[in-house]
């Protein structure tokens, strides 16, 4: 079988056929289509008609991208189940129950890529080494801090490190290898606000960097966020993997 199978302007039946091939052989599906998107779960949302890219991976990951921004506008995590009913592709996550439906108005092209990739990402660079140091010695942040995640996708971006403090509060760390600026503070605030929407007020945000600009310091104080001074480690030995738990470990505060 070919590594890449492509159909331009496919019918609904051809789309379903390619989804079946991808499921059977572990292929990555990319769909270029005009569609509507409906989400039901912890909340409800609807995205009107527009041109989008839909990506379905063998592990159940389901991503919908617009023609802007890095992050998907809607997504489902690995382990979700994908099916097709009439002209809609549906992704179901069981726990917590979430349903994402893509109603296809017009399909421009579908590609199935039978990818083989068995490698794990080996992070390098100062911020990766800072993260490794924090996981190995959490007390550099504060006594009783317990890091749980690294590079964790949440609704509004990817959190560098997420964990719990000694009182059970969720703690978000934003790491910067150089002097942190206003943008770093705004990014941290966005992550904290996103998690507060889901888990309540007991969420802390800590900016971790060698130093701060004066503007960043003032904004941190204004937003009720914190700062920890930490220099990036000098060595580059960063081969040990850090085990992570799922976000479902946390319970709403």
Swiss-Prot record:
Keywords: Cytoplasm, DNA-binding, Endonuclease, Hydrolase, Nuclease. Its EC number is 3.1.-.-. It is found in: Cytoplasm. It comes from the Archaea. InterPro entries: Endonuclease_NucS, NucS_C, NucS_N, NucS_N_sf, tRNA_endonuc-like_dom_sf. One of its GO terms (molecular function) is single-stranded DNA endodeoxyribonuclease activity. It is an enzyme of class 3 (hydrolase). It holds the Pfam family NucS_C. Gene3D superfamilies: 2.70.180.20, 3.40.1350.10. GO terms for cellular component: cytoplasm. Cleaves both 3' and 5' ssDNA extremities of branched DNA structures. HAMAP family: NucS. This is Endonuclease NucS.
């Amino acid at each position: 079988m070919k590594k890449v199978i492509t159909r331009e302007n496919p019918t609904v039946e051809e789309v379903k056929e390619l989804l079946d091939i991808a499921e059977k052989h572990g292929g990555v599906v990319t769909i270029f289509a005009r569609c509507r998107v409906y989400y039901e779960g912890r909340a409800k949302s609807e995205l009107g008609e527009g041109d989008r890219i839909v990506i379905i991976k063998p592990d159940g990951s389901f991503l919908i991208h617009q023609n802007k921004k890095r992050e998907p506008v809607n997504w489902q995590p690995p382990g979700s189940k994908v099916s097709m009913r009439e002209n809609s592709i549906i992704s179901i996550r069981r726990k917590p129950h979430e349903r994402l439906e893509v109603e296809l108005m017009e399909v421009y092209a579908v590609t199935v890529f039978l990818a083989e990739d068995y490698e794990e990402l080996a992070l390098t660079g100062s911020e990766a080494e800072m993260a490794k140091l924090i996981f190995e010695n959490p007390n550099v942040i504060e006594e009783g801090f317990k890091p749980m995640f690294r590079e964790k996708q949440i609704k509004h971006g990817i959190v560098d490190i997420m964990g719990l403090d000694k009182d059970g509060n969720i703690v978000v760390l934003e790491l910067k290898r150089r002097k942190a600026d206003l943008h770093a503070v705004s990014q941290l605030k966005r992550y904290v606000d996103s998690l507060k929407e889901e888990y309540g007020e007991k969420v802390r945000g800590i900016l971790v960097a060698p130093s701060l600009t004066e503007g960043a310091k003032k904004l941190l104080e204004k937003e009720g966020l914190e700062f920890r001074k930490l220099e990036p480690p000098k060595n580059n030995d960063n081969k040990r993997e850090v085990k992570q738990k799922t976000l479902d470990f946390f319970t709403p505060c």
